[in-house]
Amino acid sequence: MNKIQVLDCTLRDGGYCNDCRFGFENEKKIVHGLVEANVDIIECGFLMNTVEYDQDVTRFTSLDEVAKIIPKDKEGKTFVMLTDYGKYHPENLPEYNGVSVDGLRVAFHKKDRVAALEECKKIKNKGYKVFVQAMVSLSYTDEEFLDLIHRVNELEPYVFYIVDSFGMMKRKDLTRLFYLVEHNLNEKIKIGFHSHNNMQLAYSNAQSLVDLHSDRELIIDSSVYGMGRGAGNLNTELFVQYLNDNADGNYDIKPLLSIIDEILNEFYQRNYWGYSLPNYLSAAHNAHPNYAGYLDDKKTLTVENMNEIFDMMDEDKKVSYDKDYIEQLYLRYMATGKSQEEHKTDLQKKIKGKTILLIAPGKSSIEERKKIASFINEDVVTISVNYNYPLVNTDYIFLSNLRRFRELNASNREKCIVTSNIPADNVYIQTKYRELLCDIEAVKDNAGLMAIKYFTQMGAKKIYLAGFDGYSHDEKENYGESTMAFVTRTAVLDAMNVGMTEMLKKYSSIVELKFLTEQHYVKI
């Protein structure tokens, strides 16, 4: 049986879920719990030159800062940090003295591998254990990976890692890379494995490494509760239990469960991580998981839409996340549809100079149904937004969301005003999607704001808003119909509320805007 060590990366990889803001006391509690659990190697966070130090955040600029959360008695545990190539200058490292971290993990993309190994050499020369992290290992050809291994042999670091950055590595892929490394890597160098869980394979892949007949020393990364970017990581608590049961492990599970219960659960509620369909799609397309997160946060796309956007991506853009790139790709995709405006003149005649009531699907549209019913008269034009309001037969339905359009009964299509991103026949009007966008990213194509802009252009005199409640962190509070509720990150919801408020204020300077029903999280 090969010797296995566990490296817990909760304080570093988990930081993608909370912007590394664990809180100073929680940082110390997590470290203490990991030591109690007998975890072999503890990663404390990022080391970088590009930030300012904040003790509540696990992004550090010096080893003195991270030493504040490392116990004086390390109890035989190894403490490390990770630096992304180019974000820290090894010249700033003091000589190793055992007080702070014992090693540094250097993560790099294939294009930077030669220069990154030079940085690793400088770090090793200062006495630290060096962990070589070849990100997106599957992006290498066998020849390229062998060349990297030969260069690593010359360096002779502490460990060389196989890295499944996008959670797409299947057992046959892992086995192939492992034997390639095992047969060619200097025997003095340990073999590491870092995985993500986009395809729910992190646990089974780790087990397969445990079960391999090899004399090599292994280091396998995990995080408590699987806390990590996108689909998360291998769960520390599950993996060490497996080692206890199958590989003579000597880990205490209880401190790990306490970390989950007392600290991580709260972060999970605010910004969940774990397996999801978008994260599966990113892995299937060998793309950075943040792309999936961006598209999922839109809540406007079907699985087919996301697949088509991934298919549009340039191969060289998939490896590193580029927010501007995916935003432009999303907008280009959404703007590809046709427009059909033969009834536009008729609509303008019906809207110009009139009072408009826009009914969005917020909970107040149901709770204050009597107020809505009593407000409506023959001089008010009623439009429901992104759904068919069940309590009033509205004059029109405005839709910009393909998901919502598909849920609509076909008999209602003749009164639908849809944006051009929705492929639709037999609708009243199909208007240009791109012309209704606003300037704030979080709500750039929010249906309610698009409707306000559209009917303002049509000449509405006053626009009253019903069901424009904004977004609660409790998804059950957001919609009058429970089937419309969706779960998303609280940071996204907060940004949407801020963006809606800002745009409502802007539009109120162009047209008279008033709330008819109680709003909770937005205002004019």
Short names for language-model regions:
Residues 1-341:
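Catalytic cores and adjacent flexible loops of soluble metabolic enzymes
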Residues 339-524:
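Metal-ion/cofactor- or nucleotide/acyl-coenzyme-handling active-site neighborhoods
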